[in-house]
Amino acid sequence: MAGHSKWANIQHRKGRQDAKRGKLFTKAAKEIIIAAKGGGDPSMNPRLRAAIAAAKAVNLPKDKIEAAIRKGTGEDAGGDLTETFYEGYGPGGIAVMVEVATDNKNRTVAEVRHLFSKHGGSMGENGSVAWMFDRKGVISVEKSAYPEEKIMEAALEAGADDVIDDGEEWTIHTAMTDFTAVRDSLETAGIVMQSAELAMVPQNLVAVDADMGQKVLRLMDALDDNDDVQNVYANVDFPEDMPED
């Protein structure tokens, strides 16, 4: 899973930059708004529980979480968001899924299509690549911070599917229904998470060389920088020695 580690490390660095301009907070709040459309009680809404857990992992303040819930339930204005996925192919035929939360689908689909074309890819139809991914909980923990046994015990006993050695970090995969329980178990054990979110995890990775990896990364980066884009997923295995720029 070397490529996963490469993209995760890039995302973490981007995450620190995003946090400075509030983008991580915006993404977390949007996910809560959308999740809360299914009900504002986290105990009765598994997706809302997961969204709140992910928001806490990026330190979204409690008042912001509560405000997002009110928007999602319609108590406050500002909850007019539509969630959708756009699918397509990047350079080298890499499968790409783009998760968006938008108040104007026409604007967003045009922008996403333009970015695919600009960076050597193409948008596909619904279902064209989604079958290559599974929806899972994904939690990242700094590898050097805790003994392996502590991570394994806290994660697996709470129902995690797998704990993966991704170089500088442990990546924990869970079923959607077990995401909150695993996150809570790690927190109770005193383990600080770098990230905790629901994600589209590729079933298999496609290895690329450094040149092709750069092209795929530029597409993913451009999509990720769009204000309406929540997450970008691809079934790419980046080479370990690939420069980021």
Curated annotation (Swiss-Prot):
Annotated compartments: Cytoplasm
GO cellular-component term (any): cytosol
Residue ranges the record marks as coiled coil: none
Disulfide bond among keywords: no
InterPro entries xrefs: Integrase-like_N, TACO1_YebC-like_2nd/3rd_dom, TACO1_YebC_N, Transcrip_reg_TACO1-like, Transcrip_reg_TACO1-like_dom3, YebC-like
Family affiliation: Belongs to the TACO1 family.
Protein name in UniProt: Probable transcriptional regulatory protein Ddes_0536
Natural source organism: Desulfovibrio desulfuricans (strain ATCC 27774 / DSM 6949 / MB)
